Amino acid sequence: MKTSMFLTLTGLVLLFVVCYASESEEKEFPKELLSSIFAADSDFKVEERGCLGDKCDYNNGCCSGYVCSRTWKWCVLAGPWRR
C-alpha cells in the first residue's frame, strides 16, 4: 500500500514537472497567436466591414449588403430577420 501511494505521488510530481517545463517553453505562443488573430481581424475590418456601424439616414444609404437601422440610425447587416 505504501509503495503504490509513493509511486502514484512520484508519477504526479513528474507529470507536474513535465507540464511546467513545456508551459514555460511555450510562454510566448499564446501572445503570438493572439497578436496574429487581432492583426488578421483588423485587416478584415478595413476591407469587409467598412460600413458596419456608420451613421446613416434614409437619404444617405449604406454600402452593399447593409441596411440603415430604423431604431439606431446606423448601418447594420441585411438579413432575413430584418424587416
Curated annotation (Swiss-Prot):
Pfam families: Toxin_12 (PF07740). Residues 22-49 form a propeptide. Expressed by the venom gland. The keyword Signal applies. InterPro entries: Huwentoxin-1, Huwentoxin_CS1. It comes from the Eukaryota. GO terms for molecular function: carbohydrate binding; ion channel inhibitor activity; toxin activity. GO terms for cellular component: extracellular region. Disulfide bonds join C51-C63, C56-C68, C62-C75. Keywords: Cleavage on pair of basic residues, Disulfide bond, Knottin, Lectin, Secreted, Signal, Toxin. It is found in: Secreted. Residues 1-21 form the signal peptide. Belongs to the neurotoxin 10 (Hwtx-1) family. 51 (Hntx-8) subfamily. Hntx-8 sub-subfamily. Agglutinates erythrocytes. The presence of a 'disulfide through disulfide knot' structurally defines this protein as a knottin. This is U5-theraphotoxin-Hs1a 6. The lineage of its organism: Eukaryota, Metazoa, Ecdysozoa, Arthropoda, Chelicerata.
